[in-house]
Amino acid sequence: MFLPVGYIMMAAGLHHESGRDRKAAANAGLVLAGVYAVLVLLVYFAQTTTVRTDTLNDQASRILNFRRGGLIFNYDLLGYGMMALSTFFIGLSMKPENKTDQWLKRLLIIHGVFFPGCFFMPMTGMFTAMADGESGNGGTVALLLWCLFFIPVGVLAYRHFRMSRENTSD
């Protein structure tokens, strides 16, 4: 539940640094970061409260249990789709001044590629097998690949803000 808050802080910092000529992209990125946070926090809160602590009947479990690929799972994918769209716009708003910033901008824009999959795949019924407990390891593999992609974004953002702070404190 900490990732959405941390991501909003990163998006807000990059929004603050964006130039006037790129504020529309930065604004879109920041608003979409908020949409992402709301969706994902609702999903995680439901999972850690209702799903974990209550005995759910089969119908409720199909809707609320993330592992069964129902409504809550689809909301989670929608949330991460909004994050992908947010990173795309935040990346467009950046004016890189060094290699670290160039890589951060590239990764943020490339991360936007995840949006169509997160948005449209649930509409295809691709995850309906999960409802019957027939899911394989595809979701776990996808999550691990996403983590391998997004960890460098966090590291580069940390370096970006650390360098920004050092340059302004002179």
Regions found by a protein language model. Name each.
Residues 1-170:
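Hydrophobic, aromatic-enriched alpha-helical segments typical of multi-pass transmembrane helices
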